[in-house]
Amino acid sequence: MKRIEYKWLALALLWVAFFLQQGTRQIYGPLLGSIQASIGATDVQLGLVSTVFTLVYGLTIPFAGFAADLFSRKWMVVVGVAIFCAGILTSGFVTCIGALVVTYGLVNGFGQPFYYPSSTSLISQLHADTKATALSLLQLGMYGGVIGCSWLAGWFAGLGTEGWRLPFKTLGVLGLLWSLVLALTLKNTQPPQPSQPPQPSQPPQPSQLLFSALRAMFSKPAAVLIALALGMEVYVDVGFKTWMPNYLSETFGVSKASAGLNAVLWHYLGAALGIVVGSRLGDRLVKRIPTVRFWIIGGGLLLGAPFIFLMSRATTYLTCCLAMFLFGVFRGAYDSNNFAAFFDVVEPRYHASAAGFNLMIAFLFGCFSPTVLGWTKAHYSMSTGLATLAGAYFVGFVLLAFASRIYRPQNLSQTNTSK
């Protein structure tokens, strides 16, 4: 039997970790009603838990990316998975909203950032010739985690007032076990060397590395604009995933299990279609049209915005699900080339650190969405709150349109030299 090439084994290992990372994020939304009934909390307090998580994630992720470039990307992934799964596990035992802020918001929010910059940097290096395709396959792990764990959470929520605790405990234990698998199986792949190392005879100092990483991103206006556009997408994504299950249950009267599943199923089925098509187009055309990745991700946000609005105003369950599917198709197109475009701009040696700065900007903006939507629900309606998300997508499109105008082919990172 032919031996599996390591780059595909690494992708599979990181895929499962991404499934767990995103799945543990998604279980919170379908459980809102059960958590509220069990421990008592207002809509704003429930939104605050998600806001604290997103804020801590955004503040931590640049340090996680920098640590990965300075130390070991493998161990950043392993430690990150272990920490956030410990936070998820302990969330299943809390008895008040304050404790949930600590376990889910702080501990979980601190551990999760250590996974993504390191994993995407590793995959970008190992799959230099098929970068968008490999990153898109990784992204499918997110979609699978969100759909599967959302259904699981909704099903457990229907078991009774305390059923909401079981998804936290189950996924927490599974994640801790998977961190051991990663520790034993992942290789400690060394990052590529910078094109102009400061001193070939000695390793760079942390301060030099930090300055170089900051310069690698912030000296490229296109990279900054990509990060700001990602902030618009994260604002939409966090608010959508937090409140959509509750919205479907209250607006259309479906069960918690059905709401938890359908709030993400149709959206991510559409996204899977968009990501497969978008990634192949990006990889095939980028050598002939260097800005094609910008066109794909910008077009995804522009064309997705009308369907977000339709989703929020739908008067029938079928129309709402159809709108979520089409919203997902264009969200998938965005996801398919977002980090590939970013890594084209930034020097490979600093991919993990730059990805951390990128996500910091995005999540510091996106963290406000759950609380804003909770406040809008209390004072107006959740339909109104969801409708405003379409505007964030349009702003993201404008930012990417500017990025495509200022990006030049000579900025393209020479990733093919790094195997």
Language model features with spans:
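Helix-loop junctions at membrane interfaces in 12-TM secondary transporters
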Residues: 92-103, 310-323
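Conserved MFS/SLC helix-loop-helix module at the cytosolic interface between two early adjacent transmembrane helices
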Residues: 59-97
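Helix-loop-helix hairpin linking two adjacent transmembrane segments in secondary transporters
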Residues: 138-188
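Residue-level signature of mid-helix packing/kink "hotspots" within the transmembrane helices
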Residues: 26, 54-62, 146-147, 267-276, ...
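Primarily marks hydrophobic transmembrane alpha-helices of the MFS/SLC 12-helix fold
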Residues: 77, 291-297
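Juxtamembrane intracellular "pre-TM" segments in multi-pass secondary transporters
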Residues: 1-4, 190-227, 251
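Extracytoplasmic gate region of multi-pass secondary transporters
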Residues: 28-29, 221-276, 335, 339
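Cytoplasmic helix-loop-helix junction between adjacent transmembrane helices
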Residues: 102-142
